[in-house]
Structures are given as C-alpha cells and as structure tokens.
Amino acid sequence: MNSNKSLSAALLGALLMAIAPGFAFAAPKPNILLIVADDVGYGDLGPYGGGEGRGMPTPNLDRLADGGMTFFSFYAQPSCTPGRAAMQTGRIPNRSGMTTVAFQGQGGGLPHAEWTLASVLKKADYKTYFTGKWHLGEADYALPNAQGYDEMEHALLYHLNAYTYGDPKWFPDMDPKLREMFDKVTKGSLSGKAGEKPHQDWKVNGEYVDTPEKGVVGIPFLDKYVEQSGIKFLEEAAKHPDQPFFINVNFMKVHQPNLPAPEFEHKSLSKTKYADSIVELDARVGHLMDKLRELGLDKNTLVFFTTDNGAWQDVYPDAGYTPFRGTKGTDREGGNRVPAIAWMPGKIKAGARNSDIVGGLDLMATFASLAGVDLPKKDREGQPIIFDSYDISPVLFGTGKGPRTTWFYFTENELSPGAVRAGHYKAVFDLRGDDGQATGGLAVDTNVGWKGPEKYVATVPQVFDLWQDPQERYDIFMTNWTEHTWTLVTFNQAIEELMKTYVKYPPRKLQSEVYTGPITLSKYQRFKWVRDELSKEGISLPMPTGN
C-alpha cells in the first residue's frame, strides 16, 4: 500500500509539472535575456513581412522567430521613455510619472519607490545586469544600478539624436553658450555596480570616432560596446550554472540618426543608412544568440526580443515601416503595436504565432511567475502599489489564452486613455497627428505624429474593428448597418475601472515634461484665483508655465 501511495504521489507530481509552467521551473529557475531595440517598425523584420523584402535581411531574427513565438498584437507605449518605463515597472506610464521623452539636463527620473524587472527578480536571488539605452532619467536614484541591477555597463541615458546637439559638425550655427550648456549637461556612457557612484566611461558624439582611450565614442560604435558587454556577462554567467540571471540588453539602433558601424555600411540590399542599421541590429542579436548556444545557456534561458515604441514616421526616410495608421507619438496602432519574439527551446513551441492582446507591461508579471515570486503589494518605500501586468506564461508555453482583454493607449500626460482596445474593437478619443480625418478607404498620411494637430473627439469616439480593419480606416461607430454604438458600454466600463484605480493608487509626480501647449491669459488668471483660494487652506499649487 505504501509503495502504491508513493507511486501515486510521484505520478501526481509529474502531472503537475507537465500542466503548470510555474512548477516546471521550480528548479532550476530559468535565465532571462531581454533584448530591447529602439524604434523598430512593425514591418521591418522578416517575420513581419519585412527583412529581405524591404531590402534589409534579418536572418538572425528570422531564426529566432522560427524557433519560438512571434506576437502580432504586442503593444508598447508610443514613445521611448514611457515604453521603457512601462516595460521595466509593469505599470502604465502615468503611474510612475514617466509619461514623455526625457531630455538631458532635466535630472530626476524613474522614482526610487518603483519596482523594476530587476528588483523583483532580485527577490528570487537572480543575478541582474543592464547594458545599453536606459532613457529613464539622470539622477543617481533613477539609474539601473539603483533600480535592482547588480551592475550596469555602458548605460546610455538618451535617444541618439540627443548626442548630436552639442556637436559643432552637426549644428555649426548653434550659439556657443548653448553648445557649452549641452556639453555640460549631456552625460556619456555610465557604468557602476549597485551601491556605487556611477562613473563615466566616455562622452558620446555624432561622429565616426571610436576612441574610448581619448574619452569619446561616436554614435556608430555604441552598439558594439553594448554587444560586448552582453557577451562578457554571458561568459561570466556560464561559470556559475546554479545562479539564475536576468540580463537586459538595450541596443541604441534604430533611433534616428542612423549611422551604421563601418563594417555594416552598404551591407543591406537597399544600401540606406536605416536598412544598414537594421542589418547591424540583426547581426548583433545573432552574436548574442550564438554566444548563448556556444556556452550551453540556451537550454534554460528565455529570450525575449522587442522594441520600445512604434515606428517614428515623422523622420522618414530615416525611420521604420508600419502597415498601421499613425506613428510614434500617437494613440494609433502604428505608434503602439510593435514586433516581439519569445524563444525558449523545449518550452516554447517552434514557429508559434500568437495574436492575443499582450504587451511590454506583461513582462513584469510573467518574469516574476517564472522566477516563482509574487508581485509586491507595496512599493519600495512601503506604500500600496498596483501593477498593470498580466502573466502570459500560459501563452508562451501553449497551456492557455492570454488573460488580458483590454489595452489602454496613452500619449504624453494623459490620465484618461486616448484610446482603448477591448477585444477586437478599438475606441479612439485622441486624434493627435491626423486630426481624425476620414480616409474614404484609403491609407492615411501617417507622417504626422508630434508635428500633427492635437485634437480630441467632441462627444463620441471613432470605433474600429481591428480584426477586419487593423489600419483604422473605417469608423464604424455610426455607419448605417455596420454601426457599433453599443461598444461604448464595454469601453466605458473598462475606463471606469481604470479611473477608480487612480483614487486608491494616485499617480506619481511627472518626471519629464516638455511644452504642452499654450496657456491663455484668462486660464492663467482663473488658475491663479483657485491657487490663491487654496493657499488660504494651506494647499500650495505651482503656477503653470506651459511646460
């Protein structure tokens, strides 16, 4: 009888291991390699109809997709800083205050109270490492080595074009005092271990110079150092097979200005700088994957590749391609739906394709689940916290559908979403960029993001069926027999539930904000009256500045 009970227990254990992905990783915990590119267009890569067909072959990313899962409804945020903040924290950007692009000299950054992928995985005893683009602020408390990463090497704090502002070869007409200011406030490559004061490796400029010994490296060579840092970490990690690791590699390409490394110039079929840079990005991903396999780390490592936001078509032709309406900086699909590939041999089915609603927000809950830790109930300063992240491990391992049914789209400092996806329907309230123009069934000019007009619908949203019309061409809210006015019930309910969370979990102070539109004298005086009245009750409000 005892032997039968033992056998039954063993069989039950085996069954649980087979059906529950979380149990399967109890020992050993999986390693995680997260590769994030910059501004890659949905249609740039081979698995999405790009690659060789667009004059920019991507054999390494093609191979990654062939061996893993490709996502077709994966969402980021519409610009760099919010996209990276959402990915790191598992929270919509307005909760952390990281709502818009961070510029040099602003200081501040990701609040220390926020949890990141790294700080949560540290609770599961992971070794954590960061290299490449951070773009989440300049203050010491906001840097990777203060946000859960054991070490950061060649952390870069800005978008690529920020490194050209003080370069006289780029802008010879700039006032010398302004150039001096940019030189002073623009930080270069930063490195340091947790608990240490970061040190600057070298400054960055927009030239074809690779002279770290002289204290300067140009834009074309940055990703070489990011790749080298990633490979160095993997080689060291292989010496400690019982220590699970999380490495976050963030390539600077293909944000404009695209300046391919010399060995990749004219290596694409189309010979353009953007295409050459895609070829370079693909090659560097391939080098990391080759090293992973060479070291035998591929057997227990989840690799996840994605990008921070949609294609920035405002800067065409130095820009990615998206088949969707809109561009970076808008609530349209073109600004938010991005490429994403997950790979883990023996765990993720080769050649899998998924169209569930998932996104960068979901990496937090997913990685925590794989590591066997719960998401915290309080932030790092002891205050209650909420996450907007869903565990998509059932999707990855083929055991179930994605739990997410909605996606909220935000641009800049929106508190209520500018658009909402519920199931396969999408409501658009913020018409930023294209002014909500009717298309007549034709493609919309998407070369207007931040440069386009800012406008909200008066009363009712535009509604699109993303299954039938992923390009958002046909508004079906009130159109004869196709009208879908009834969808407002679902959209309103989703927004109501979101807005309730702000009451219990108030958003943090904005960490980066640029010009947000004109302030009229009447509005200024009205605000001043309210401010003066509140001051009598001891409540202080800053005066608006237009920023």
Regions found by a protein language model. Give the residues of each.
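Formylglycine-dependent sulfatase
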Residues: 2, 9-15, 23-457, 461, ...
